[in-house]
Amino acid sequence: MHSAANAKQQKHFVLVHGGCLGAWIWYKLKPLLESAGHKVTAVDLSAAGINPRRLDEIHTFRDYSEPLMEVMASIPPDEKVVLLGHSFGGMSLGLAMETYPEKISVAVFMSAMMPDPNHSLTYPFEKYNEKCPADMMLDSQFSTYGNPENPGMSMILGPQFMALKMFQNCSVEDLELAKMLTRPGSLFFQDLAKAKKFSTERYGSVKRAYIFCNEDKSFPVEFQKWFVESVGADKVKEIKEADHMGMLSQPREVCKCLLDISDS
């Protein structure tokens, strides 16, 4: 009886990283959630982390998000997961919400892009460009890749950008780890521009929560709050002294927020 009650209380958290990063960013949060008795799946999206595919093999946003879609497809029909998406990972969360709304108890966006069912999938990026200075990315590098007739745009995070805008509240060890493990990524802007927007009937039916990281210098808190004001969230949390990488600079606070959101 006791074990049955524990099983009922156990939740399954699926963690989705942002662009150029990987499942490794959750190395502090995953054991905290597991020690609280929960199941955790940290996903490496295509051509990210230790996923074996290369960026030049990934042609669409759906290709990029495929590992998350595979996890969602494997979830039993009677189970619901808690999704957590960080940064660009919020867009992959949106795809999972549109495709498998019945398998998600709540989708949590942390310093993340939040798709708007009333606008195109590129709308969040257009607003980011409006609200954030053009030199925000500092020494990050952008270049074309793939088919010369229809090239994609790749992005490599610059060490200065990472140190000053993403990991400024993290330990030097976490910053060094990130410099070693980041990979070229893409925002798949051209593909998203052609994609059908997410629906209010499916994407919009999933309960949403947002976690603000209030010392984020790459996703300023004003931009994060704009998502909540324009798209809406059922629950909102704020983590003080958290930079863009809140799961590394404030892992216990992120864990606490997640447990509170998932319990309500």
Curated annotation (Swiss-Prot):
Catalytic activity: polyneuridine aldehyde + H2O = 16-epivellosimine + methanol + CO2
Enzyme class: hydrolase
PANTHER family named among the record's database cross-references: METHYLESTERASE 1, METHYLESTERASE FAMILY MEMBER
GO biological process, one term: indole alkaloid metabolic process
Regulation: Inhibited by DEPC and HgCl(2).
EC number: 3.1.1.78
Tissue specificity statement from the Swiss-Prot or TrEMBL entry: Mainly expressed in roots and, to a lower level, in leaves.
Name used for this protein in its record: Polyneuridine aldehyde esterase
UniProt-reported outcome of changing D216A: Loss of function
Gene: PNAE
Entry keywords, A to Z: Alkaloid metabolism, Hydrolase, Serine esterase
Pathway membership, UniProt: Alkaloid biosynthesis; ajmaline biosynthesis
Single annotated GO MF: methyl indole-3-acetate esterase activity
Propeptide stretch(es), residue numbers: 1-6
Binding site for 16-epivellosimine: S87
Free-text biotechnology note from the record: The strictosidine aglycone-producing AJM7-DeltaHYS yeast strain expressing pathway genes of the VOM module, RsGS, SBE (GsSBE, RsSBE1 or RsSBE2), RsPNAE, RsVS and RsVH, accumulates vomilenine. Additionnal expression of pathway genes of the AJM module, RsVR, RsDHVR, AAE (RsAAE1 or RsAAE2) and RsNNMT, leads to the production of ajmaline. Ajmaline is an anti-arrhythmic alkaloid commercially used as an efficient drug for the treatment of arrhythmic heart disorder.
Pfam families associated with the record: Abhydrolase_1
Subunit structure: Homodimer; homodimerizes in aqueous solutions at pH 7.0.
Role of this protein: Hydrolase involved in the biosynthesis of ajmaline-type monoterpenoid indole alkaloids (MIAs) natural products, important plant-derived pharmaceuticals used in the therapy of heart disorders. Catalyzes the hydrolysis of polyneuridine aldehyde into epi-vellosimine, precursor of vomilenine, an intermediate chemical in the biosynthesis of ajmaline.
Active site (record annotation): S87, D216, H244
Domain AB hydrolase-1: start-end pairs: 12-122
Family matches, as InterPro entries: AB_hydrolase_1, AB_hydrolase_fold, MES/HNL
Impact after mutating H244A: Loss of function
Family of this protein: Belongs to the AB hydrolase superfamily.
Gene3D superfamilies for this protein: alpha/beta hydrolase
